[in-house]
């Protein structure tokens, strides 16, 4: 998921994954119950917010969601996406991201995080 190049961050930045760029593609037997969990990243995130780091001491807060309205956080355990009966052999799941606004200017740099996807069936 790429939030792009930003010169300021005075308002939230919303993005959505695409096939080959952040979407989760699952191939499974139809009718199987599955759960797709996302961990909170390597920079000390939580169900409230995740963090991207520039490799130094600067971080930017963001979150990942299951829906375009950004109402349902996509996380682990009870915040995982549950599918009671997998509908077809292959499904693509979009990940919706929000980079939260900051007061002032964040430190210059490339900010990254690594989020692990766990599929349980």
Tell me the role of every PLM-derived stretch.
Residues 69-78:
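Short beta-strand and strand-turn-strand segments in soluble, beta-rich domains
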Residues 39-41, 63-67:
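Predominantly extracellular/luminal cell-surface or secreted proteins
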Residues 61-63, 112-113:
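Residue-level signal for functionally critical sites in structured catalytic/ligand-binding pockets
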Residues 1-54, 80-121:
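N-terminal small/polar-rich segments of proteins
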